[in-house]
């Protein structure tokens, strides 16, 4: 009887089936692992691509910020009343600038001149378009002039016309183009490129009431990106001519 029971149990044993089920389960787990790995790989590839694009963009922006810049070549001032020995007050400034080697072109309409004098700070922007008309007649004038053909007087009053009053003069600067080999600068788009030379004209009489003898001035000519041009000078103790080199 016992032998018969053993034979029946052996005939209907589930060991083989258990092994089959175990094999199928292992296969399912393996397939799931492969799918998870594939999804993870896809996510990694996508993330790597995104990071690469961001790194490239950041690198380009950083390169632009590092290479772009303005340099101040010289600064001259005008004391228009030199006939009075005790006058000694600079009324107008001509800040000659160019852009640094390798710099991207810079739109001067987006540039700011910051100046500090006697503890007072001012921020000046391009005067741009000024409407000087009346109810019936309109004249549109830009604070933009060209002396590419040459000039013997950068302090010609016509160059300062748009900033001659206290309203514009205390808040804005004008542009005088000295060199523009590509003939690309315009009043609407005063974009300075390499080899261009420009004077930024400032009415310091309107901004600070003038700059007196022996006084220090500091500031910057700053574009939206890149290194600024540095303004740092002390006016001479005595003005012996109407035009004075300050920096």
Swiss-Prot record:
InterPro entries assigned: Flagellin/pilin_N_arc, Flagellin_arc
Posttranslational mods: Glycosylated.
Subcellular compartments: Archaeal flagellum
Gene Ontology cellular-component annotations: archaeal-type flagellum
UniProt GO BP: archaeal or bacterial-type flagellum-dependent cell motility
Record PANTHER family: FLAGELLIN B1
Record's function text: Flagellin is the subunit protein which polymerizes to form the filaments of archaeal flagella.
Name the UniProt record assigns to this protein: Flagellin B1
Classification of source organism: Archaea, Methanobacteriati, Thermoplasmatota, Thermoplasmata, Thermoplasmatales
